[in-house]
């Protein structure tokens, strides 16, 4: 059944039943899960597939959505970026899913964008990213740079007195764009360009000896060095092991990571990583009743040794907002759900409330955590909710842009010329 005919059927059912419940032939409602279960990103993405299965089970136990049970349709794009696009098309045209929750890397998301925009699919993307994008067909439930990268850099500057920066990233669009933003930001804060070392490595990189030696050498003049890491996937294991082998402690050269959380640390001996940092919008150690309930449910579903992390919370928030939006709209049709998403609120797991903004980003708190023995984090800094900014203020070409799908109907709006630059996301 096409999305259009499904919408017509839903509307007819609403008229007949008077309660907005989907008619029998529209059941089950299908939820696509697009996460790598093999390849270099499986270390991070497999757990996101698992949490989606838990959330679907929980919702079905509550009666489903619009009178229908939910059915999770899981595919494995295998850390293969073109395959993400193929699997997204398969989910929408063959499986006829009503919504997709998926992706980790930005290169995989950008591979999917043309497909979901062509077919009017709906993607909930749960991971921090570089910004510089706002698609009509994506809700970005992870952090934009102003909700992670910029606050973490401020912490290095203001709290740790870092004077020289090593920006280490995996070689793809998220680290490169984020580091472009950070380099511009650091220079605006008085850091000399020659005191900023930038290095990129491939996915799955394992030989870190030379790069760690280069980072150590930055401090030969006695200035405090700090590492900002946008390294993704299993390459993180080798990086942290090499730091330990080189005898580099957090007191010597602190590292703040944007893609390392509880899941990535669960496979490491963290005793020599104590004191290094990560910036997210959630940590498992958050001491709230809601988080305790979530952790208990997760361990019961997935196993006592399993941990929670930030992108899991993003899926938790996004999924529940989608359920509430579909319920409010009386339909799972994409355009109806999208319209009902704006202003959706849902309690986050750290004690506040997530709010969906007209730019398809969330208002979320910024947390900085310090690695402790055992692979958990001490939360050492937490803000109130920060509104996600799709277009950074720290790149001149982006500072004039804004996104407002609710009132302006545009994700790339020039505030100076008062025109919509473009509607599709082939930036």
Regions found by a protein language model. Give the residues of each.
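Extracellular/periplasmic Venus flytrap/periplasmic-binding protein
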Residues: 86, 130-131, 137-246, 285-293
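Gram-negative bacterial Sec-dependent N-terminal signal peptides
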Residues: 1-24
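Extracellular/periplasmic periplasmic-binding protein-like sensory domains
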Residues: 242-316, 326-332, 386-417, 421-423
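Beta-alpha junction/loop-to-helix N-cap segments that form part of ligand/metal-binding clefts
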Residues: 43-50, 57-58, 62-132, 141, ...
């Amino acid at each position: 059944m096409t999305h259009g005919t499904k919408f017509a059927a839903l509307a007819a059912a609403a008229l007949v039943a008077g309660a907005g419940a989907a008619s029998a032939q529209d059941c089950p409602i299908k939820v696509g899960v697009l996460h790598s279960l093999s390849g270099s990103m499986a270390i991070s993405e497999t757990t996101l597939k698992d949490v989606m299965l838990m959330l679907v089970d929980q919702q079905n136990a509550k009666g489903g959505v619009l009178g229908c049970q939910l059915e999770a349709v899981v595919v494995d794009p295998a850390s293969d970026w073109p395959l993400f696009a193929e699997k997204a098309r398969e989910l929408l045209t063959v499986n006829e899913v009503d919504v997709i929750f998926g992706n980790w890397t930005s290169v995989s998301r950008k591979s999917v964008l043309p497909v979901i925009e062509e077919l009017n699919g709906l993607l909930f993307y749960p991971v921090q990213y570089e910004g510089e994008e706002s698609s009509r067909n994506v809700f970005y439930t992870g952090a934009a740079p102003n909700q992670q990268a910029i606050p973490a850099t401020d912490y290095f500057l203001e709290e740790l007195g870092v004077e020289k920066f090593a920006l280490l990233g995996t070689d793809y669009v998220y680290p490169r764009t984020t580091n472009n933003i950070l380099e511009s930001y650091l220079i605006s804060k008085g850091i000399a360009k020659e005191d900023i070392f930038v290095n990129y490595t491939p996915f799955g990189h394992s030989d870190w000896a030379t790069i760690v030696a280069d980072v150590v050498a930055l401090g030969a003049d006695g200035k405090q060095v700090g590492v900002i890491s946008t390294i993704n996937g299993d390459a993180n294991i080798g990086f942290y092991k090499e730091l330990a082998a080189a005898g580099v402690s957090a007191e010597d050269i602190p590292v703040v990571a944007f893609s390392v959380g509880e899941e990535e640390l669960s496979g490491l001996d963290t005793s020599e990583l104590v004191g290094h940092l990560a910036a997210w919008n959630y940590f498992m150690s958050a001491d709230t009743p809601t988080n305790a309930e979530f952790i208990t449910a997760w361990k019961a579903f997935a196993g006592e040794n399993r941990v929670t992390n930030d992108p899991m919370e993003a899926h938790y928030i996004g999924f529940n907002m989608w359920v509430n939006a579909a319920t409010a709209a009386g339909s799972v049709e994409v355009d109806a759900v999208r319209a009902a998403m704006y202003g959706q609120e849902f309690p986050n797991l750290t004690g506040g409330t997530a709010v969906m903004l007209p730019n398809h980003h969330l208002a979320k708190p910024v947390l900085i955590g310090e690695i402790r023995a055992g692979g958990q984090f001490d939360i050492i800094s937490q803000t109130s909710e920060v509104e996600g900014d799709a277009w950074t203020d720290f790149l001149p070409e982006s500072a004039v842009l804004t996104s407002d799908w609710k009132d302006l109907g545009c994700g790339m709006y020039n505030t100076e010329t008062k025109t919509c630059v473009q509607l599709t996301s082939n930036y």
